[in-house]
Amino acid sequence: ECDRHIRTYWTYYSAVSNSVPIATEYMFSDLAVYGKTDVSPSDPNFQIATGLTPIGGYHTTQNDGEYIGYFWDETYNAIKYANTILTYIDQVSGLDSATKNAYIGRAYFHRAFSYMQLVFEYGDVPLVTQIISSPKQNYRSTKKAAILDMITKDMEFAVQWVPEQANSATIGSVNKGGCRMLLAKCYLATGQYAKAQAQCDILISSEGYSLMTSTFGTFNPGGEPKTWPITDNVIWDLHRPENKLIATNKETIMGMVDEGSTTLSFIPFPTMRIFGPFWNSTGTLKSPDGQNGGETWARNNSNYNVNLDFLRAIGRGIGTWRPTYYAQHTMWKVNGVEDTVDLRHNSQVGNWGSMTNIKYNHNGSSWYGKNFLLRNPSNNALLCTDTIRDWFDWPHYKIFLNDVVAEADPTATQFNGASNGGKADWYLYRLAEAYLLRAEAKFYLGDATAKDDVNAVRTRAHCSQLYTGNVTIGDIMDERARELYLEEWRHMELSRVSYCLALSGKSDEFGNAYNVATYDKQSGTDLAGGSYWYKRVVLDGNIYNKGTLNSNGQNFNYTIDKHNLYYPIPNAAIIGNNKGKLMQNFGYDGYDPSTPEWDNYEDAVKDESSK
């Protein structure tokens, strides 16, 4: 159950079609914002600064927008599943000590993975380590540092006892490599940088993993190669679901299986619909002669043209989540050059998508077969009046997934992503991230060879630009964004690095140093102060707190506050704990710095038996 559950942070278990949980991680980051301009500009997905409260803007299940409540509920469910194993494993007869310890180690992994998420998304939270026999309503919050100490100890045990993937009969279950990755993050979060580097050294040099540097596996030609041709390349192959978990992929450390046709084996993942642009919007995107810009012709329609079948080639996006300009352009600059040779940002091979790669396909238009234009060449008027939702670049190699149900239906006018019977296998950890974690550890240690680890990832992507001097933490986080889009939990990682910077005393790329006692206890929407997370979101993302944007006939004002580094502790959890008091996060209603907390995990564990 734990292994199946972990994939539901990426794709929602009930297959809601317009959003998925992982998108919340990008909304609260430098890489994306909410794009549904057909909803009210007062929606909390736009107005995070004022709309996100312990009782408002806090969704667990909805078709659009963020899933903050989902992360709280499902993460404690994951902890419950892990604790079930840990609570009852002694009652299982016939297990030798190695097998028993391997199961304990796997359970520790799932619990540690969950608490790593909780402490960097919610701050200080209740520590639950056992299955209770009756309701407990007097929890205290446990301080983040104490929880990190506990999960670090647990992961040291897990690395010792969980077997390598090569010695496991099951793909997608916890393995030693995955445990090392999580332990490295635990060491970074507890200021043990040399130990973090050592774990990454083992992964990179001693366990049989290697970066994939040439084409491999099965070549997937894409949705319609006559419309959108793909030149086979290693980055394209690396991110095809059919190649992620195969034995020849030496880069995979730990993956998540999502394929088949049953609810246990497969959850649909409509990536193209959710993360792709609304290129066929009939009201807001026109050709210069006033016709609809893009049409989603079915294959049995007389207007269909296989050379202009963008429906199958790139899917029918609705722009629920829009990448920031930074994610589309700025972050791809190294040495002052936007590196379009980089296979991850390369439209020539078909990996990267730009609106000007799409062609008008409305029959009767004088612009039929010509490339999309943002402005009318005759008068410079905008041809797209909803540039938030309809007009942006996207990483096609990441979001393209075959829609096998639509492909089997010649009348289909929706191609959304992985559908029932298809594949959406995903990476949890791969070796490229180990290089970037090692670079981060070296940064804190003042080791100039951090640039070599970043450049190893860039060299594999055939980048024209490499780093030549000392890399900053910003360079490392930029490379994470380029390499790990829709893999990493971006908000959580920015929050983790914000804490690591404060612990280390190192300055960020903006020249700021942070105090561990104050970095996460600030509020306001101005540029003064705030955490590293806030600086990245506002300065790099460059959409939040920048004033009004007009799109689709409405004025949108994206706002986010310094205190939104952490999500609020949900009011339902506070009310349910009516014999005790949980610490609410700074900046939200109910914050009280005098609230008692556990400052070590041992006392918190002892208290679990009290009612």
Language-model-derived ranges and their functions:
Residues 3, 61, 75-76, 150, ...:
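Long, intrinsically disordered, low-complexity segments
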Residues 315-455:
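C-terminal substrate/ligand-recognition segments
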Residues 1-44, 187-373:
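An aromatic- and glycine-enriched ligand-binding surface/loop that stacks and positions planar moieties
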Residues 148, 193, 447-448:
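TPR-repeat structural position
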Residues 3-10, 14, 32-122, 138-146, ...:
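Conserved, well-structured interaction surfaces
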